[in-house]
Amino acid sequence: MRKKEISMKNRRATTRRMRDLLAGLLLLSTAGFTAQTQAGVALGATRVIYPAGQKQAQLAVTNNDDNTYLIQSWVENADGAKDGSFVITPPLFAMQGKKENTLRILDATNGQLPQDRETLFWMNVKAIPSMDKSKLSDNTLQLAIISRIKFYYRPAKLALPPDQAAEKLKFRRSGSSLTLINPTPYYLTVTELNAGTRVLKNALVPPMGEASVSLPSDAGREITYRTINDYGALTPRLKGVMQ
């Protein structure tokens, strides 16, 4: 019996030592990695508007850091899939520290997009940091950062000026939801949306379409809201009434 007790004690001691050793190794390996979030590359706008018939649109990219970055850019459609409707040049380039470059966006749609309303795409710019050669032997985790902004293709001669679109928005209560109705040919990014004293979620309302947000049962009928204009700025606060 005594031999069995000693054997059990030895096993428990061995298990404890193994557990402590594994914990120590995990701590060391975690400490050996440094997550470097690269925030040095900034875009010159929060959205891109591409007017139909224009040869190109431009987007400034600035490297505020001292390090070099590899910049990769592409366009996605509204569903998030890569799309060849627009060509970006240069699509891939090295950007030195404290420098600025310009991305040129060229129309390759051949007039195939709707001409009575805007079409939404997404502009993606990935900044991949260069690796310091002196740290190649270290366990350093380099993180690439993707900046993703809205990219609107805007047909020519739309019936309504873009700065008049926000005031055309309509609102309808549908059970526990508020439906935002956009009769204009423009996408409307609605923010600071309130029903009475209740604060509601932001919404992106497609042209000639609708979007819905949750509506508390005690929400008031008076609606106040703002939208974001072509320059990324907030429009004046507007009022609406729930139908």
Predicted region positions:
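Beta-sheet-dominated interaction scaffolds and their linkers
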Residues: Q38-A60, P161-K170
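Terminal connector regions
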Residues: N110-L158, R221-Q243
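Bacterial N-terminal signal peptides
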Residues: A23-G32
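Intrinsically disordered, low-complexity segments enriched in serine, threonine, and glycine
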Residues: F171-Q243
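Buried hydrophobic-core signal for structured, non-transmembrane domains
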Residues: A57-N63, I105, F121-K126, S177-I181
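Short acidic, flexible loop segments centered on an aromatic residue
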Residues: N64-A81, P183-R198
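Bacterial N-terminal signal peptides that target proteins for export
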Residues: I6-G24
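Intrinsically disordered, low-complexity Pro/Gly/Ser/Thr-rich segments with frequent PxxP/GP/PP motifs
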Residues: D83-G111, T197-E222
